[in-house]
Amino acid sequence: MSIEFRKELFADERDDNLNEIGKPTQRQDMVGHVTGRSPFYDDHLFEGLLHMRCVRSPHHHARIRSIDVSAAASMPGVKRVVLGKDVPRNLNTLLSLLDFGLDDEPLISERKVSYKGEPVAVVIAESEHAARDAVAKVRVDWEVLPHVLDVEEAIVPNAPTVNETYPGNCFIYHGKYTHQKLRYGDVDAAFAQADHVIEGRYQMSPIEQAPTETCGAIAAPENNNRYVCYTSTQALFFSLGTAAKLLDVASNRLHFIGGTVGGGFGGKVDSLHEPMAILGSMLTGRPCKYMFDRAEEMQVGAPRGAERWYVTDGVMNDGRLVARKFVGYFDSGAYTRLSSYAIIKAVGHLPGPYTIPNVYADVYCVFTNRTPATAMRGFGITGVDFAIEAHMDKVAEQIGMDPIEFRILNSYRDGDMKAHRRLAKNTALIECCQVAAEKAKWSLSDQAKRQNSLTGGGGERAQLPNFTKTDENGRVEGFSTGSYAQKNKPGAPAQPPQPNYQPQPAPRPSAPPPAPPTAPPPQTPAAPPPIPRPTTQVQDPFSAPTPTPPNPPQPPAAPPGGAPRRTTRFSSISGLRRR
Amino acid sequence: MPVHVETHANISDAARALSSARDGRFFGGGTLLMRALNEADQSIGTIVRCTDPVLRQVRSEGDRIAIGAGVTMAEIMANRDLAFLAPVARIIGGPAVRSAATVGGNLFAEPPYGDFTTALLALDASVRFAGESGQSTPLQDFLRDRANRRGRVVESVMVPRITDPKALRFVKVTRVKPKGAALMSIAAWLPGSGGRGCRIAYGNMAPTPVRAAAAERALEGASLSEQGIARALQAATEGLTPPTDMFASEWYRREVAPVHLKRLLLGQGQ
Amino acid sequence: MAKKPVQFTLNGSEKATFVEEGQNLLDVLRRGVGDLTPKYGCAQGTCGACTVLIDGEPHLSCLTLAETVEGRSVATVAGLENGAALHPLQEAFMRNFAAQCGYCTPGMLMAAKALLERNPRPTREEVVEAISGNICRCTGYEAIIAAILEAAGSGSAASKGRG
């Protein structure tokens, strides 16, 4: 395989002294890999190792009336059958470590299950076979409950409550809303004046990361009242914090060893194997292993969640996009895991790499009776990018435009304002389109070939909308605004809402209806406020609800003679540096 | 439950042990049974193995060939007399599966497995149980009542001797390349000129491999041309109720069956 | 559960151990005799991470009834090296960056060794077929195929190694 460097692009922005890129450097772990000596977690042998296997729910949604473990506990080789009551602090959410979300998931469920495969008891036995035999002997008396597997069906009134922490089946954003909002300009006004309004619906199924090494951990008592834990985790300190919290021990009593992972792809970020194995070790005083078999990895290993997106574009006859609206639903499965955070990433990414002066998004993190969803490569972005690019093709086709030229025309360029209210820099989509077209022998017009990312941006395209229409849709009470999904705590008064950031004063939206005097229901959808009218003179008629025709972003001019620039490109991978 | 494994040197001893064992299963190559043991399948109590050489033999019996039930897919591929079956054996799993998987085991394989049996069905094969000398059971009858045959030891499978390797055509339709479980497999045996006497079998279009009887009738006397096979393609799934499972829906199977059958009959590349 | 004694050769060395009835070879290699090079990926014959050679043929150790290797010869990656020198396949895998997470690598190497032992000069198609039962989820197939072809080109990959 060869790499082709296109060094003529942005040539004046690099000193081109690449020391590593393009030159093979041997990996330090390669000898271990080709000799089979790389130490994966399961390659640590312990005398007297015990094996843990879960009793799992056969139902999507059911109440546990009782669990009878007597037959299982008396089987040969069985050391212990563990129940939820044995977990010191049996409620957690991974992102609580980042103050992002409420504890909503038990390690071993005690009262009800909300997805097929949810663990309700764990057998610890001398061999894996003995553990499996004992699992088959545990009797659970289930009261099967109605379930909901579709994101939009889950958020209608009277849908079964999947997750008691969020009774409306939506994660609560900023303590206030049933969804994450993006408001930039006024899409409705722009749609009214666009030549075409084109809608699309896109959805992605859950995707299992399917690492070849299944998730697992081995824990054993160590000296000084500590426990050692060998684990396949991709996120050692997340796992350490999670184990310390669920087991209610100081993290310095846990000695985590990881780093050699047999494929993760995101699916080993929020595994719960470490607390389970350590709990087994605490209860038996013996080394314990808890690992998924392949069927568990596929059925209950957290996948990339399903997503559904509705995308509506307002576009002019000449191909300029004037508005884009998203309504998105992430299927979080039964518990929060990482989907709520993925949505923050997704919304920050909208409307994709295009300069569009009016953008709107409502994105919901929805709880359904499906396997909890987590990270997978590019999580939060991959799904909506699929929706955006599929929609770009659809719009191009409907207005009769070449799909690559349509992208080049609407590409963001250096200096353009993005919907998250930061100026675009280091943009390179136009060049990517041009090179892709060249490689695919796709002919482009001379006009499209002349475009570049360095010129044509900024100026009017750098301006924030003069008016941004906001609303209080999806407002809930009973949660604190102090964090992303805090419930009100006694003595911690709810903070006043943060002002919406607006470049120029605009009428404040009307206040939400007052909370009921007694314990509030978790969700009180507010009626949409009246549409505010702008009172100030607008400079950018395009983003204002005035009767004048919409003015799309200034079409980029042909590039001048390549004015030299000496800024550093590609300086920030995560974008955090700019904050 | 704890599993008991007993090994017999003689096939009649093995057959007796299997018929009297509580929750007994016969061990062929292990590719299916070991998976069940690894999962601690609670329905298995006894494993009966047999090392009798008769199970590994391939021998001529007149115009037919008797393939021992313990012959592996790798051995089929290496046997010159069975060259017509080599392309079928080659698509069973990877090399490591083929050095274990046996002809006899494949007879009992549940969907999505059992592609080799699909080819055997198209060949009008018959099954000989341990202790039977002259007689054998037509494979079609065997499959109709397969669940009840688990308690008996298969000694061999009888197939016609085929010299023209093009007379047996086979396709395994998968979504994963180069190898994956079949959403359907199709075998066609064309013993005469054109469609005369042809036998067509599908895998994964029913709980066991099944014959495409309507398509066979439509091909009788027809030429293997686009026009000649048109009626057979129309009847490709007549009388069948293909399943909807994780590999494909019933609708999809009905839609693509004639497409793949057409390519197979016209000898077009898959 | 009753145990059975089993003797076999592992990478040229005699091994004797007790196995449980119904136990698979992968478990016996890893926990019984301490050869950790074959990996657990599925225990159902779909991933190939546990591939070993038995009397020179590739087998999935997770689907091999342990007691059936009585008197036979088992080869794993642990026997590929010749003293301190890597096997040509191992060197080719290194040169071609044919491992990312490394978990499928032992199975890939043994599948490749089985191929080169019976077919020292395989075509690319034959290489693809030889590893068609081995899954690499890091999507490194091209590098793996290149490594096997390169090792075959060196001509010495088939004969090296113990066991």
Residue positions per predicted region:
Chain B
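C-terminal structural segment of proteins
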Residues: 1-270
